[in-house]
Structures are given as structure tokens and as C-alpha cells.
């Protein structure tokens, strides 16, 4: 897999029935918990939190939230450590947000759901401390990744965390195997998502193209990587 696949995933172009959408996000939630995807994102926030004050309110925008697993995990993680973490869970898909809302329970107090495009956010720039996403960038073209990183940079005053798959043959084989017992959407999109994923050097190069050389790549268990960092001398949000 020397190059990324440009084949479109089924869920990029179609909206399956709600029960299929729910099954997809339930599967992804389990994979993230069991194979370290959630831990990879929380590890980067753990590093950032060394500079936070006890009880500090921290605003996070979780882009392409899907089933909301990462948004809920961030709220729980923050509260467990004495921080007031508030997460705006953003997705362009209404069916994804329906699935996320159905799965929100005690975490709802720290969550706010918004159905919108990250490039057309109904808020001013710099309103969030951090912008995060998971399993989003492999859906995008290289040029769209650059544009999206620049949007993240405009929205976040402190930092960015991007979590995604690493393109490897071994990961492709595991994805093919794990999705066999599930629905046709997962059997198609799961392995394809690995073929569409980046290698670490490719994603780092796109960050440089976006003018965000302060973002660094880290590899994690479960064939995951994060592209993340905090801006030196955190930018202040513009006055309203």
C-alpha cells in the first residue's frame, strides 16, 4: 500500500438506515475502547493538562464526532481529574448525531451537539481552547486535510489533536477479519478506511503545508497515530 486509495467509502456518499448507522458507531466505539484509539487521544490531552489549573474550564470542539465516543470520553476524563471540560460534538450528519445523543447518559451535562460543517461554523473564530477529531482525516483528500487543519487552527486558541489510522498491510488484514461478522457497510468501509489512511510522514507533510509545523506525530497501539500540539504562547480569543 504505497499510496492511499481514493475509493469512496459507502458512508461518505450514502446515509444508511438509522439502525445500520447505530451498528456502525457501536462497533467503532468498541474498537476505540478495546484497541486503544480513545487512549491515544486522551494521552495527548493528559500532556496538555499539565498546564491547566484545577477546576479550569476547557472548551473542546470534537469534529466529525460520529457516535460521540471521544466526546463522552473527554468529558469523563476531565471530570475525573478535576477539570471542567466542555465538549461541543460536531457532525455534518444528522443520523450520526441521533446515534450519539441516544448513547449519552450521565455525560450529557458537559456535552453540546451541533449539526454543521466545520468550515461553516455558527460561531466566531477562537471560541474553543482545543479542536480534536478521530477517524476523520482518512475520509478527506490531501488538499481537504490542509484546509481542515487551517480551519482547526482558526477555531482553537490553544491546540489541536487529530487521531487516525495508520496505513499498513497488517492493519488492513485485521480490519478485514474483524468486520466479517458485521453488516455490509462495515465489511466494505472498514478495510477501505485503512487503504485510505495516511502514513505518518504523509500526515506530517500535510501539517507543514497547512503552516502548522508545531503539530507533531506520535504512533500508538492499535495502528493509530496522533497529530497534535499546543501553540506556544496560546493565542487569545478575539473579543466579541
Protein language model features and the residues they cover:
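A conserved beta-strand element that flanks and buttresses the S-adenosyl-L-methionine
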Residues: 132
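N-terminal auxiliary segments of SAM/dcSAM-dependent transferases
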Residues: 1-14
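A short, conserved alpha-helix within the catalytic core of class I
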Residues: 140-151
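Conserved beta-strand signature within the Rossmann-like core of class I S-adenosyl-L-methionine
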Residues: 156-165
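C-terminal alpha-helical "lid/dimerization" subdomain adjacent to the S-adenosyl-L-methionine
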Residues: 165-210, 216-218
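Core SAM-dependent methyltransferase catalytic element
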Residues: 216-240
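Class I SAM-dependent methyltransferase SAM/SAH-binding core
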Residues: 59-61, 67-120
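Class I SAM-dependent methyltransferase Rossmann-like catalytic core
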Residues: 14, 18-44, 48-49
Amino acid at each position: 500500500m504505497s499510496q492511499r486509495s481514493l475509493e469512496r467509502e459507502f458512508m461518505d456518499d450514502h446515509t444508511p438506515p438509522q439502525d445500520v448507522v447505530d451498528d456502525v458507531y457501536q462497533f467503532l466505539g468498541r474498537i476505540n475502547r478495546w484497541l486503544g484509539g480513545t487512549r491515544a487521544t486522551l494521552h495527548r490531552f493528559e500532556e496538555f493538562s499539565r498546564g491547566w489549573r484545577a477546576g479550569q474550564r476547557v472548551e473542546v470542539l470534537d469534529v466529525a464526532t460520529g457516535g460521540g465516543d471521544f466526546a463522552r470520553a473527554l468529558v469523563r476524563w476531565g471530570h475525573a481529574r478535576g477539570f471542567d471540560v466542555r465538549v461541543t460534538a460536531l457532525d455534518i450528519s444528522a443520523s450520526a448525531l441521533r446515534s450519539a445523543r441516544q448513547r449519552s447518559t450521565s455525560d450529557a451535562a458537559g456535552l453540546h451537539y451541533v449539526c454543521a460543517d466545520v468550515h461553516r461554523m455558527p460561531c466566531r473564530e477562537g471560541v474553543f481552547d482545543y479542536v480534536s477529531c478521530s477517524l476523520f482525516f482518512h475520509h478527506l483528500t490531501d488538499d481537504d486535510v490542509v484546509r481542515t487543519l487551517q480551519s482547526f487552527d482558526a477555531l482553537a486558541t490553544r491546540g489541536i489533536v487529530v487521531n487516525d489510522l495508520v496505513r499498513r498491510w497488517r492493519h488492513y488484514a485485521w480490519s478485514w477479519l474483524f468486520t466479517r461478522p458485521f453488516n455490509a457497510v462495515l465489511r466494505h468501509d472498514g478495510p477501505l478506511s485503512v487503504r485510505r489512511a495516511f502514513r505518518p510522514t504523509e500526515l506530517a507533510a500535510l501539517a507543514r503545508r497547512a503552516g502548522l509545523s508545531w503539530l507533531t506525530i506520535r504512533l500508538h497501539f492499535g495502528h493509530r497515530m496522533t497529530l497534535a500540539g499546543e501553540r506556544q504562547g496560546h493565542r487569545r480569543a478575539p473579543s466579541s
